[in-house]
């Protein structure tokens, strides 16, 4: 059998047979894959750590008839801190669920984005919503929708008040809004701008106010649902 190595993060899995597990991973090289871990539910299995959600490392795999088989694993980071803090755990699960919803083939920028998000979530104590807001904003931007505009997408007038048109996923002015528009407050817009312009490593240096990050989470979650049909997991 031919073997290969991939760098991947575990999204989740399903127990099969008596001791095996099917693993869902997102890899740098090939995108989303399903892999088989043989005998991994045995107490002395050398691959036990590889079956855990959030685990990031290098998988050594062999080609199988239908599903490739993991034969070795070198952990890079298992982000264990996420499993010891319930709020971080919920936020981390929501991030991986979003990744699972949009990922398919190889996407190196998305891979780097999710590792950066989980690393910051695990090792920094940031206010709630900062990280998932930035991750959602990046996903929506990658889908081709821009929140950070100074002009109405319909009439091009300079914006003094902003509304998200959920029908088209674009920002409009008061004159162009309809019944399916959501108001974006100045605090929310300021939060979106700061989060977008800051790297994950620099999020600890910014301070948002007026509950802008919470409003941003609600608006981004609603917009993501309208754009993809996928409901963002609750982190409350």
What are these regions (language model features)?
Residues 1-21, 26-236:
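Non-catalytic alpha-helical scaffolds and adjoining flexible linkers that form interface surfaces
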């Amino acid at each position: 059998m031919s073997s290969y190595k991939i760098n991947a993060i575990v999204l989740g899995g399903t127990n099969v047979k008596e001791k095996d597990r099917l693993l869902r991973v997102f890899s740098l090289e090939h995108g989303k894959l399903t892999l088989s871990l043989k005998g991994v539910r045995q107490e002395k299995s050398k691959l036990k750590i590889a079956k855990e959600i959030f685990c990031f490392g290098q998988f050594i795999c062999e080609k199988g008839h239908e599903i490739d088989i993991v034969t070795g694993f070198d952990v890079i980071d298992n982000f264990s801190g996420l499993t010891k803090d319930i709020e971080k755990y919920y936020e981390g699960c929501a991030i991986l669920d979003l990744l699972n919803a949009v990922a398919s083939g190889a996407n190196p920028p998305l891979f780097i984005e999710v590792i950066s998000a989980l690393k910051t979530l695990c090792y920094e104590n940031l206010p709630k919503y900062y990280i998932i807001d930035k991750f959602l904003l990046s996903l929506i931007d990658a889908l081709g929708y821009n929140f950070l505009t100074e002009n109405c997408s319909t009439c091009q007038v300079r914006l003094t008040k902003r509304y998200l048109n959920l029908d088209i996923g674009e920002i409009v002015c008061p004159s162009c809004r309809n019944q399916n528009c959501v108001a974006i407050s100045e605090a929310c817009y300021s939060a979106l701008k700061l989060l977008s312009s800051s790297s994950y490593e620099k999020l600890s240096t910014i301070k948002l106010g007026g509950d802008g990050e919470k409003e941003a989470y609600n608006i981004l979650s609603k917009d993501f649902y309208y754009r993809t049909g996928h409901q963002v997991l609750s982190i409350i």
